[in-house]
Amino acid sequence: MPDLSFSVDGAEAVSFAAAPLVSFKLRIRNANVSEQIQSILLRCQIQMETTKRRYSPKEQAQLFELFGEPERWGHTLRSMLWTHTSATVSPFQGETTVDMPVPCSFDFNIAATKYFAGLDDGVVPLNLMFSGTIFFETDDAGLQVEQISWDKEAPFKLPVSTWRDMMDHYYPNSAWLCLRRDVFER
């Protein structure tokens, strides 16, 4: 019976894609190193752990629209859902590393974009939460199916520069503009 653990070894912008992507290098380990994993249909929810970093006065001002006055951040600053993504993992034994693509754009998630854009530097603490289906061989060469336990998570500190470099690559010298509906309809 598989007992998987997950960690993130790094992240980088994908240079040649139809849409902006950040690729996370995901390491998957099975505690039973001799067990043959045939495939994993992996789902991942990524949360931005906004309370786990410090903010400069300039960043606090830039994040006002998301979190309000810094004096109220004890009540308004919360973890935010960034996105959901999925990946299919090929057969392995013991351990494997896979690329997990995460689509990004200015208009995909306005709150996430405002958050990333409001940071000058440093890292964005993330929590990747996994679920999905594992297909594995049994000792008698049968195939078993099992769900990934809901408690499987991996923290990662995404450099703000990774997101910024990706946006600069796909949207050079551009920014997303969010308009009120009445202004847009003119």
Show which residues each predicted segment covers.
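Short beta-strand elements
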Residues: 61-70, 135-172
